Amino acid sequence: MRMPAPTRVLPCCLLALAACSAPHPKPGPLPRFTAPTRHHGEIGANDILFRAIALVGTPYHSGGNTPEGGFDCSGLVGYVFRDVAGIVLPRTAEEISEIGAPEIDHERLESGDLVFFRHHTRSISHVGIYVGEGRFVHAPNEGGTVRLDRLDDPYWREHFSVAKRI
């Protein structure tokens, strides 16, 4: 004996609804980052520097990593590289400095290179993005904003540690 059409449709609908409500698997932890080697112009160093410069004036916020919420130094760097090149960097300046990216001699800096500093500690505590002509963009301190500074400024020259190219 055949079941009436509404009786056949109801079990199919219930089955479809049950399949839609299945729990989604939780994402696992992010893998440890190893920086790809960037060849001049490949990732778009100009895009990186333009994006970084466009964020000048954004308020500093400790732990911040968005234009809307403000930036700290590593949040700014992470945002720019993620936004422009799809590269997800570690969260702190020290962790970013430890990625497998080549160190760059101070005299060979190119736009988009990362510059790292030590402030009264042995470990890296600050990072910025080199934009050319001896300048870099960074989020320096509470109460300030993202800004351009010169690497040859006495303070930054004294605290400069290393540069890396991603």
Regions found by a protein language model. Name each.
Residues 26-74:
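Post-signal-peptide N-terminal segment of Sec-exported extracytoplasmic proteins
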Residues 36, 58-111:
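Catalytic cysteine-centered active-site loop
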Residues 17-19:
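C-terminal motif of bacterial Sec signal peptides marking the signal peptidase cleavage site
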Residues 51-59, 79-87, 118, 139, ...:
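Structured segments of extracytoplasmic/periplasmic soluble domains
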Residues 1-10:
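Bacterial N-terminal signal peptides that target proteins for export
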Residues 2, 21-40, 44, 103-105, ...:
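Aromatic- and glycine-rich peptidoglycan recognition patches
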